[in-house]
Amino acid sequence: MTRISREMMKDMLSVYFIMGSNNTSADPVSVVEKAIEGGATLFQFREKGSGSLTGEERLLFAKRVQDVCRQAGIPFIINDDVELALRLEADGVHIGQDDADAEETRAAIGDMILGVSAHNVSEVKRAEAAGADYVGMGPVYPTETKKDAEAVQGVTLIEEVRRQGITIPIVGIGGITADNAAPVIEAGADGVSMISAISQAEDPKAAARKFSEEIRRSKAGLSR
């Protein structure tokens, strides 16, 4: 296994869907399937918080979703659980600033994808130095999904990181919808992540497709 290239990582971040079983009232595996059919390019398994699965139920759910991702050929990333990622041979791990140490995580997972949440320029630089393949930056907009979210930043931090010549792949996080995604890409992000905008949508496939079309349109506009 070799480390993922930055160009490939940037493409995979385009429509970055995050979900746990407690983020939807529908069948969660079906929601992931529909999201991928609609254009999700990466999936992060985030099974935490009130009403989340534990133990064997959590493991079985993770395996089912991983199978869906494998069949579709998109990366399956696990949030903040290196042990589970290694056990399932996941494609990668995403950690927050209050989770595991990035350098220790990189050492533990080898060449798997490593994503790190960052809320200021110094955290981005530290993540890059520790071997992160991408950073998640935000919250860009107000969000209801993460009760412990940092202060809303808009797109200014993403712009500042790019102004400083930092080229690590970036995915925008927090309160992003298909209608407000364009400014995130225009600021310098390579993709956007979402939970409820797809997981709680009446039609997850259509919601994912709208994101996919908007991101494609925004990236095309930048390359002109």
Swiss-Prot record:
Q: Which sites bind 4-amino-2-methyl-5-(diphosphooxymethyl)pyrimidine?
A: 44-48, 79, 117, 146
Record EC number: 2.5.1.3
Paste the cofactor note. Answer: Binds 1 Mg(2+) ion per subunit.
Q: Does the keyword Transcription regulation apply?
A: no
Q: Which residues bind 2-[(2R,5Z)-2-carboxy-4-methylthiazol-5(2H)-ylidene]ethyl phosphate?
A: 143-145, 175, 195-196
What cofactor does this one take? Answer: Mg(2+)
List UniProt keywords, sorted A-Z: Magnesium, Metal-binding, Thiamine biosynthesis, Transferase
Q: What GO MF annotations does this protein's record show?
A: magnesium ion binding; thiamine-phosphate diphosphorylase activity
- Record-listed Mg(2+) binding positions: 80, 99
Quick check: keyword Transferase in the entry?
A: yes
- Stored InterPro entries: Aldolase_TIM, ThiamineP_synth_sf, ThiamineP_synth_TenI, TMP_synthase
Gene3D superfamilies xref list: Aldolase class I (3.20.20.70)
Q: In which pathway does it act?
A: Cofactor biosynthesis; thiamine diphosphate biosynthesis; thiamine phosphate from 4-amino-2-methyl-5-diphosphomethylpyrimidine and 4-methyl-5-(2-phosphoethyl)-thiazole: step 1/1
One Gene Ontology cellular component term attached to this UniProt record is: cytoplasm
Top-level EC class as recorded in UniProt: transferase
UniProt record similarity statement: Belongs to the thiamine-phosphate synthase family.
Q: What role is this protein assigned?
A: Condenses 4-methyl-5-(beta-hydroxyethyl)thiazole monophosphate (THZ-P) and 2-methyl-4-amino-5-hydroxymethyl pyrimidine pyrophosphate (HMP-PP) to form thiamine monophosphate (TMP).
Q: What is this protein called?
A: Thiamine-phosphate synthase
Question: From which source organism is this entry?
Answer: Bacillus velezensis (strain DSM 23117 / BGSC 10A6 / LMG 26770 / FZB42) (Bacillus amyloliquefaciens subsp. plantarum)
